[in-house]
């Protein structure tokens, strides 16, 4: 404790001007001679160097000068005794600080160091400063270690060397310097003790390195002020920032033992800047795989360019984690989308490129592309300004030629699009408070296994998670909440999207999403969507609903299992196919929809839960499995659960194969779709040909291709009521709509038959 500050103690002796009777020629104790008597010293009131001093003639081997007053020595207190002297005449003496230790019984303590370092007064008239530190502990810099026994002391100087020298001595001062040694006691190191200057300009790199090297397990303290650091700095000690750092954008601060966001915020005095520097360190150090935000909120007034924060690299493929915090969008000016329009050419021979692009310099990478023949969620992945071309995230289904496009660049709290490749990045337990002004996360152009876990995306203006390239390959979204900013907006008027993905192997698991225009658009294959609840209702009675999940690859090879599909539907398209007409391949194929709860309320009767929308002709459907789902409509019924949107084209119903529609439950659904479909037929009047209706209960009102089983429900009888035992043969695809089957008997018969009909 610095008692001179906390208790107002003044340890300095009385100045010489008070009188030489305060100054002993011996130990300073009672009854010793003072200089007003012995006469080797006189007071000099005016000196060109000292405000007032004494002139002393050295007459003894050790000429002593001690203050007769008692200088207290509180516990854990360190005192610096200091004066200035100059030789006026005579031989060259030496000088040192000295003291006489006394205990609580007013007894001399002799087992202590009685004096400090000695210095010679070599040059006539030259001012020499002599100092010594006295204190209880054996610490670096303590000259006179007195331990715990002394209670007070009589301090002054000794003059040694040849007699006859004449010296002048300035007033002796005693200063409490305990704070220097309290750093040792408190296990801290102050960077200022190693040359750091808090002026915001002087380069303090070497001082910080020296303090870190000297810490040896202690904590490094950066006191109040602004410290410039010119290059990347690594501190291996624990560190505490009371002041702030000024560093170039390219210089990284690596805090190996204090690596957390609160420390970086303290280091840079700003939440956003602290986060940028912490992320820069995360990608420039192998000491940590995760950045703990410490529950802090980072207020963001403009998008954070995550690659610019790192600056020195645009590729990173090792696992890194950011966890446990919140990003809060502030203000509005930094979040307004940039909108550019321009003509451009498109050819299916270069299906991912726009060429001859107008205003290309103003079009930003990551812009959403809109125009005639452009599918949903197509983005600018890269651009070549000199060549006038733009690379697209997906092909366009009907845009051949030269036309006008609109390019809209939305702004994101965390924007990773500057990375050419970024893989294995995890975001855990983070809340993105978009505040209806910002969007949440834009992914890198290329990357693997982006993973978002237990995060909240709240009120994004347009987008939650956006992929502009293939940075979504293998993306995992687990246990996240997507909260709309459009709860009071009618479903068909909403503009926000929870997330999109362009590449394959995406997994959406156990998420919750409320009242977006769409929850997710997935343009790749091999997706797994399980355990999610996505709700998109509104207050419009008999209103329309939009897709919750959109699959835009015809050969999707995906599974949708165990979800709660609430007032929305699953839409399956091929809008990202540059040749949308079917010519070869699988067409719409390989989709499993199983064990889901489908619910709608107060919707239009033509609403459906599963919608296929071909953007080209002649497509079939194959390897579709819709099993063990609950389909329920409340506050009104709907006609059927599945449908084909024929805006651009219908499906080719002769090409429906391997379709399984069974084990589903239907409530308030007029047509309970099944395949295989069991049809019960009663033939009241005898006839050799029975025609059976499927009542549009085969999937997608498809053809009744064949009968796979027959089971008489009562005895088949002839017109004369004789029993008939022969088996009829069957004919499929009967009638103008090919949705009937025929049973042909060898004679006129009547009765009741259960028939299993399949489309495939």
Regions found by a protein language model. Give the residues of each.
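Short carbohydrate-recognition loop motifs
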Residues: 34-64
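Extra-cytoplasmic beta-strand recognition segments
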Residues: 60-97, 130-132, 172, 694
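Extracellular beta-strand ligand-recognition surfaces/modules
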Residues: 130-167, 172
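Right-handed parallel beta-helix
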Residues: 170, 243, 290-295, 318-329, ...
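Right-handed parallel beta-helix/beta-solenoid
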Residues: 175-206, 245-246
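Autoprocessing Asn-cyclization modules and mimics
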Residues: 247-284, 298-316, 324-400
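Extracellular beta-strand/beta-solenoid scaffold signature
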Residues: 254-281, 303-311, 335-338, 349-353, ...
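Extracellular attachment/recognition segments
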Residues: 673-760
């Amino acid at each position: 404790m610095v008692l001179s500050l906390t208790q107002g103690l003044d340890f300095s002796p009385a100045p010489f001007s008070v009188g030489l009777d305060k100054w002993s020629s011996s130990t300073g104790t009672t009854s010793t001679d003072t200089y007003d008597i012995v006469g080797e010293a006189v007071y000099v009131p005016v000196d060109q160097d000292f405000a007032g001093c004494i002139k002393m003639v050295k007459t003894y081997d050790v000429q002593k000068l001690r203050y007769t007053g008692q200088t207290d020595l509180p516990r854990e207190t360190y005192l610096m005794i200091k004066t200035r002297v100059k030789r006026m005449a005579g031989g060259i003496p030496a000088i040192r600080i000295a003291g006489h230790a006394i205990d609580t019984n007013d007894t001399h303590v002799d087992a202590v160091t009685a004096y400090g370092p000695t210095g010679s007064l070599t040059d006539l008239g030259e001012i020499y400063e002599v100092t010594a530190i006295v204190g209880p502990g054996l610490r670096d810099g303590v000259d006179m270690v007195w331990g715990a026994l002394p209670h007070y002391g009589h301090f002054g100087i000794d003059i040694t060397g040849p007699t006859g020298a004449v010296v002048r001595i300035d007033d002796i001062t005693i200063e409490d310097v305990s704070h220097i040694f309290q750093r040792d006691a408190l296990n801290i190191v102050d960077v200022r003790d190693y040359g750091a200057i808090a002026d915001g300009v002087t380069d303090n790199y070497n001082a910080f390195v020296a303090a870190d090297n000297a810490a040896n397990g202690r904590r490094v303290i950066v006191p109040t002020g602004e410290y410039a650091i010119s290059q990347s700095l690594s501190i291996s000690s624990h560190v505490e920032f009371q002041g702030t750092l000024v560093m170039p954008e390219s210089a990284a601060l690596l805090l190996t033992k204090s690596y957390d966001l609160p420390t970086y915020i303290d280091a840079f005095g700003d939440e956003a800047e602290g986060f940028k520097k912490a992320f820069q360190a995360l990608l420039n150090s192998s000491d940590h795989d995760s950045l703990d935000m410490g529950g802090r909120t980072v207020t963001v007034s403009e998008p954070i360019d995550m690659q610019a924060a790192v600056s020195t690299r645009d590729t990173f493929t090792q696992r890194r984690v950011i966890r446990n915090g919140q990003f809060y969008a502030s203000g509005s000016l930094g979040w307004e989308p940039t909108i550019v329009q321009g003509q451009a050419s498109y050819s299916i021979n270069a299906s991912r490129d726009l060429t001859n692009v107008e205003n290309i310099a103003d079009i930003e990478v990551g812009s959403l592309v809109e125009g005639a023949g452009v599918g949903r969620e197509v983005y600018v992945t890269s651009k070549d300004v000199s060549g006038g071309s733009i690379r697209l995230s997906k092909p366009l289904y009907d845009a051949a030629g030269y036309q006008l496009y609109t390019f809209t660049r939305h702004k994101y709290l965390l924007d990773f699009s500057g990375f050419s490749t970024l893989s294995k990045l995890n975001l855990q337990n983070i809340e993105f408070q978009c505040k209806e002004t910002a969007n949440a996360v834009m992914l890198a152009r290329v990357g693997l296994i982006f993973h978002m876990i237990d995060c909240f995306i709240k009120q994004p203006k347009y987008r939650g998670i956006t992929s502009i390239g293939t940075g979504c390959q293998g993306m995992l979204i687990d246990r996240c909440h997507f909260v709309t900013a459009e709860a009071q907006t009618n479903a068909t008027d909403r503009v926000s999207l929870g997330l999109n993905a362009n590449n394959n192997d995406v997994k959406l698991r156990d998420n919750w999403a409320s009242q977006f225009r769409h929850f997710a658009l997935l343009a790749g294959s091999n997706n797994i969507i399980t355990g999610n609840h996505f709700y998109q209702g509104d207050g419009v009675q008999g209103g329309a609903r939009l897709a919750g999940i959109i699959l835009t690859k015809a050969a999707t090879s995906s599974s949708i299992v165990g979800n709660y599909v609430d007032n929305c539907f699953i839409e399956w398209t091929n809008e990202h196919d540059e040749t949308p007409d079917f010519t070869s391949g699988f067409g719409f194929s390989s989709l499993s929809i199983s064990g889901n709860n489908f619910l709608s309320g107060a919707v239009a009767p033509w609403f459906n839960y599963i919608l296929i929308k071909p953007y080209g002709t002649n497509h079939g459907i194959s390897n579709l499995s819709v099993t063990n789902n609950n389909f329920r409509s409340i506050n009104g019924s709907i006609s059927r659960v599945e449908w084909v949107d024929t805006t651009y084209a219908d499906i080719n119903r002769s090409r429906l194969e391997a379709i399984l529609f069974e084990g589903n439950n239907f409530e308030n659904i007029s047509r309970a779709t099944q395949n295989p479909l069991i049809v019960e037929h009663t033939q009241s009047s005898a006839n050799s040909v029975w025609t059976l209706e499927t009542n549009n209960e085969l999937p997608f009102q498809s053809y009744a291709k064949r009968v796979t089983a027959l089971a008489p429900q009562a005895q088949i009888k002839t017109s004369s009521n004789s029993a008939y035992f022969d088996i009829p043969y069957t004919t499929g695809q009967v009638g103008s709509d090919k949705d009937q089957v025929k049973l042909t008997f060898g004679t006129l018969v009547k009765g009741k038959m259960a028939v299993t009909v399949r489309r495939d």
